[in-house]
């Protein structure tokens, strides 16, 4: 019988909690420990009967650790992730990889230098429907893709922003939500050649954007527009069409549109 993988969760916020629940039910993984300083983390430690560490260094000094999931605020991704990569501990890092390009490059560089697995949490590309669409595109069964349009309009209640990192540099719906859509459209259409983008914080007045539009040109010549806002009540977003999360109603309205031609 294969040994279970001992995984620690760094950060017990919204996504960290989801990982904790998933691992606790897994037949292939074991919940090794959690790292956080919140009162909620103390309660989770008692509930799941696992060690609680107050910082990454304490975890690194523990025994029998096989891998970690980093689910801390975006601004802390580099600091936490590189600490594990240097010790050659595989990391599943919640998206986005970081809050800026230089930091992202350092994380990737550390993974390559230490020859240690690093996976970013873009789970949507593993959806069976997305995988099938990818297969059909790659085999040319859908013809040539000329353009694509992606909508990500999902209203967020003001309580969502009680977490201050979400309204600080490195937060905002671009890094929290639209990164999923950008990853998936690139997964389907390939590498990007040109980018043009506009953002505004006109509605919420936070230090981060609440609305954005992005225009892309892919190496294939295909064009794409992505339209994002977390201030609009609307039926068009992946969350409302995929049915992955029971917390969201299913609208059956397409948030992704591909235009194709057969030559």
Regions found by a protein language model. Give the residues of each.
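N-terminal Rossmann-like dinucleotide-binding module
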Residues: 1-48
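Predominantly a Rossmann-like dinucleotide-binding segment in NAD(P)-dependent oxidoreductases
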Residues: 124-207, 212-216, 223, 236-238
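Beta-strand-loop-alpha-helix segment that lines the small-molecule cofactor/substrate pocket
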Residues: 62, 67-74, 78-125, 140
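Conserved small/polar residues in nucleotide/adenosyl-binding loops
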Residues: 261-263
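Short, Asp-centered acidic motifs that coordinate Mg2+ and/or phosphate
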Residues: 33, 67, 147
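Short, surface-exposed loop/helix-turn segments at secondary-structure junctions
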Residues: 233-247
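Conserved SAM-binding strand-loop segment of SAM-dependent methyltransferases
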Residues: 50-56
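Short loop/edge segments at beta-strand edges and connector loops
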Residues: 54, 93, 120, 196-199
